[in-house]
Amino acid sequence: MKLHELHSAEGSRRNRKRVGRGTSSGYGKTSGRGQKGQLARQGGHTRLGFEGGQMPLFRTMPKRGFKNINRKEYAIVNLDDLNKFNDGSEVTVETLKENGLVKKELSGVKLLGNGELKVKLTVKVNKVSAAAKKAVEAAGGTVEVI
């Protein structure tokens, strides 16, 4: 196959509809807009959510909640992710990034107790759950909150 032999799939590309080009085209005169009325006019569409003057649904519902500007979001690492590391090694935020376990650091890294830890590690993270701390110490490792 050569570059000049490439073709797009059948039906994947469509010619644009050319309107106002004579009555025999099927889209002449009113250009597919019907007769007179709001929708035949330029800019004659209502805004999104407009229900013809009836009280719109989004205004009938009460407002709820708020966005906390002080919210801290942590990158999450589970115990079974830490089995990648060698026995006795030190796990920090930097080593987690290097191994692809943490993509974005956000406000820090939190260790959660999902899974089973099979290696002895020294873990240095920003936050740790009680179950995760217990599991790391049961495996013979230590947890340090930085």
Swiss-Prot record:
Name recorded for this polypeptide: Large ribosomal subunit protein uL15
Gene this protein is translated from: rplO
Basic and acidic residues composition bias: residue spans: 1-13
HAMAP family: Ribosomal_uL15 (MF_01341)
GO CC, any one term: cytosolic large ribosomal subunit
Xref: PANTHER family: 50S RIBOSOMAL PROTEIN L15, LARGE RIBOSOMAL SUBUNIT PROTEIN UL15M
A GO term, aspect molecular function: rRNA binding
Source species: Lactobacillus helveticus (strain DPC 4571)
Signal peptide: none
